[in-house]
Amino acid sequence: MPARAAAAVGLAFALVLTGCTSPPSAPDPAPDGAPFPVDATADYQLGGAYPPPAGVTLVARDSTEEPLAGAYSICYINGFQTQPGDQWPDDLVLHDGQQRLVDPNWPDENVIDISTAEKRAAAASRIEQAIATCAASGFDAVEFDNLDSYTRSDDHLTLDDAIAFASLLVDRAHELGLSAGQKNTSELGRVGPDTIGFDFAVVEECDQFEECGAYTDVYGGRVIDIEYTDALRRPFVEVCADAATPTITILRDRGLAPQGDPAHHYESC
């Protein structure tokens, strides 16, 4: 499920940190599929698929759902933590003593162990099954959630580990004809597109945390921002009127409830 970066890491620090890392090779080029629609109106449907409001031309859905015909469709994959109910071997998840390490906000999700090249390769082979499902279903792109899991790893993982693993996943997505989206993790800066190969960004609450520029400076109009009704620092109309806000910005309920659910809320800039 969506999880926003918990670490407030400065961009300048991140560039110093990652500048010491030489990638094994340049990222695979973006596929020649449908271009990212910078003028889109988006909906974020991870809580369940439903017919979107009129005018929506970009939709993100879980990998277990079908893409929306006629729209640019993004397939959600929990790339750095286990999905609830998925059984992962002990040696591919981190441990806190004898217990599997969990995300404190999502206690049914374990943090995947990507601390070595061998573990990254083994974990990627499992995630690649979901990527292949997205491609076979007809999605245009994927987003890999919990890229920031290293911040919840009790120092077992580093940003460099996350970069190396993300590079494997993005390369595989590109091989299958899918564009790939960076999820949150503003500290990446230009490492996102230049080293890993991300094609766009999916961001949660960049206005709330006053960091939208960290993404638009890198990806321009290829940024989707989701703000949430329970954590707005100002009225949504003011968010939309701000030139710093990504053009593709929506307001959703925290649980991303489907249309028809009393908790459902959707607005778009």
Segments (PLM) and residue ranges:
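N-terminal export and membrane-targeting signals
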Residues: M1-L11
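Short, well-ordered alpha-helical packing segments
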Residues: A12-A14, V170
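C-terminal motif of bacterial Sec signal peptides marking the signal peptidase cleavage site
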Residues: V16-G19
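Glycan-processing catalytic domains of CAZymes
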Residues: T21-C269
